[in-house]
């Protein structure tokens, strides 16, 4: 038996005659009369429905939702703009439509409500029903306290210095090395302070780079990441941890050898103690990063670097301002500030840019038009890889210098000088590495073949594209084009600050260039997005979608 409740007459206001008429007899959702005792007129939030295939669903019986569902184009989530209703709405009516669930009367009598925006009920809930009080109702306060505790713990090791080193002389040498200055900003000043956690998360990042390159050379390792799912990724992560310990030992030895001119008593005991402390500090920082990732409020590696850059920002900005006032270069200071603001705006714009591919679902059939209705889309971000290519590129450029300090080979020393910021090979090598890591990381996160198979299993298809290999080829083409745009964007970030420095004749934010701004903006937007998703999921847990007994059905 096909059952559904009839739409109340007061919900028909403003609808065309065709929309008021009952569905045809061949419709999979054919209404029947409801008993007189059943209250059908009050404005209910949800009414249960049952179709011939035994599927359960809900029908929003408020006037705003009836206007959305009764029209010829059923688009409750408002993912498409080609509907006639969306073309005729004004921005003012859209605003009042979104705010209607918040300020509207729950009794339904007397006052008429504005139509909701074409984005639908789900978007209205997301946009208008989240306030500051919702943050304190779920587990988010506890998660944020844990996050702040982990971040404070990671900063503690930066202020515990190695003994027996002339830090003033080393800090003066650090000012002359731009690449070390950049790495110092990533460690939050840990290298300049010679803290036991000065290596930070860099050894773990280097280990990730090596395993991602090995995955291209050894297909078994690539299959372990992709085909074995979560279990395979955990195995690769465990191997990466072991490799990061090896990288930490090598980098600790290199840093100790680099500190030799500034050490009062360079003995074997001091070397072993310092290498052990630096290695343990790196392992400890990596452990904290993984615990932060488990909170699902953002990537632990990115958040650790985010905290380090934030802690480094005041001193860096103060140094630039002091230099500008000392030289009387006020125009250059204004140029740097304006460039910084434009850089932030550009990063936010590109970070939120998406390429949306519409999807058709075979199970979503419109009884009024007799056609399949598009009700979802596949989003691809222009900069889907985020800040990881820049972090990988910076760590790769620092690797020759570390190896040169460890081995003392002349060609490595020359390569390190050429790859330093301002060197002959720094800019082209940095751009090429960013493009490579961006392309690779994009396809590491999104496998076109796997994505095509998932769409096929879910009964979804891209319009005018055959399921299977054709869909995979189409997705690969889209990702190729997106990766080119993302690489160009990241290359501009890498090259832009040096051009600003040449124009303003100031050392603009030593170690705090476009890469650091991208990390800050990317981490902030990612964390805000995940907090919003957590609040919305918490609110949906309290919604009763199939409360049939409540209405006597």
UniProtKB/Swiss-Prot annotation:
It is found in: Plastid, Chloroplast thylakoid membrane. GO terms for biological process: SRP-dependent cotranslational protein targeting to membrane, translocation. SUPFAM superfamilies: Preprotein translocase SecY subunit. Its main location: plastid. It holds the Pfam family SecY. PROSITE patterns: SECY_1, SECY_2. Disulfide bonds: none annotated. One of its GO terms (molecular function) is protein transmembrane transporter activity. It is a multi-pass membrane protein. The chain crosses the membrane at residues 144-164, 194-214, 243-263, 270-290, 297-317, 330-350, 384-404, 417-437, 482-502, 505-525. Keywords: Chloroplast, Membrane, Plastid, Protein transport, Thylakoid, Transit peptide, Translocation, Transmembrane, Transmembrane helix, Transport. The keyword Chloroplast applies. One of its GO terms (cellular component) is chloroplast thylakoid membrane. Belongs to the SecY/SEC61-alpha family. Component of the plastid Sec protein translocase complex, which is composed of at least SECY and SECE. The central subunit of the protein translocation channel SecYE. Consists of two halves formed by TMs 1-5 and 6-10. These two domains form a lateral gate at the front which open onto the bilayer between TMs 2 and 7, and are clamped together by SecE at the back. The channel is closed by both a pore ring composed of hydrophobic SecY resides and a short helix (helix 2A) on the extracellular side of the membrane which forms a plug. HAMAP family: SecY. This is Preprotein translocase subunit SECY, chloroplastic. It comes from Zea mays.
